[in-house]
Amino acid sequence: MEPKASCPAAAPLMERKFHVLVGVTGSVAALKLPLLVSKLLDIPGLEVAVVTTERAKHFYSPQDIPVTLYSDADEWEIWKSRSDPVLHIDLRRWADLLLVAPLDANTLGKVASGICDNLLTCVMRAWDRSKPLLFCPAMNTAMWEHPITAQQVDQLKAFGYVEIPCVAKKLVCGDEGLGAMAEVGTIVDKVKEVLFQHSGFQQS
């Protein structure tokens, strides 16, 4: 995938694939990234790419991700001089929808505060708010129940972003309660719903 090759607004949907950019952060739910990407690729007419934080890399193998995978190093390797492309801007132009799954507590706090210190948060800070952005919170129950979490989630919603709520279950740490990322099937169904609402996109 070469995001700089074409501008999404320049080509009708019927002539090209719909571009979904998946952001993945450092929650243990990042273990589900290979399954999530696989299920998204099952939707006809979708092209998928992934932006990862460095901490998220701990939870999956790049060999299990069958699409282009971008990380912080790519931002700086691509840009050498003033005329070179800026990756986070090219990615926000390329993508028709941004799905952040999982969105950990750290990145939630950064985005709510406007901090952009890695490739993913730069994409989110530069995001075109006329395009859908979906986020899937995932964190320990104690972190989820902290009062600041609700404030930060509300802030993202105020930006126009769509929450795919976390669920209650036994977490990897052994605690039981709210904070687990929504199931992959739920996430994929929501992506389909939003694609249809925003573009009239239909599976062939």
From Swiss-Prot:
Q: Which reaction does it catalyse?
A: N-[(R)-4-phosphopantothenoyl]-L-cysteine + H(+) = (R)-4'-phosphopantetheine + CO2
Q: What gene name does this entry carry?
A: PPCDC
| Presence of keyword Flavoprotein | yes
Q: Which Gene Ontology BP terms does the record give?
A: coenzyme A biosynthetic process
Q: What is this protein called?
A: Phosphopantothenoylcysteine decarboxylase
Q: Where does substrate bind?
A: 140
Q: Which organism is it from?
A: Homo sapiens (Human)
The pathway this protein participates in, as annotated, is: Cofactor biosynthesis; coenzyme A biosynthesis; CoA from (R)-pantothenate: step 3/5
Write down the InterPro entries for this protein, in alphabetical order: Flavin_trans-like (IPR036551), Flavoprotein (IPR003382)
- Renumbered to this chain, the signal peptide range is none
Q: Give the UniProt family note.
A: Belongs to the HFCD (homooligomeric flavin containing Cys decarboxylase) superfamily.
Q: Which domain of life is it from?
A: Eukaryota
What is the role of this chain?
Answer: Catalyzes the decarboxylation of the cysteine moiety of 4-phosphopantothenoylcysteine to form 4'-phosphopantotheine and this reaction forms part of the biosynthesis of coenzyme A.
Keyword Disulfide bond carried by entry: no
A GO molecular function term, named singly, is:
phosphopantothenoylcysteine decarboxylase activity
Spell out the catalytic residues: 173 (proton donor)
| The EC number(s) this enzyme carries | 4.1.1.36
Q: What cofactor does this protein call for?
A: FMN
According to the record, how does the cofactor bind? Answer: Binds 1 FMN per subunit.
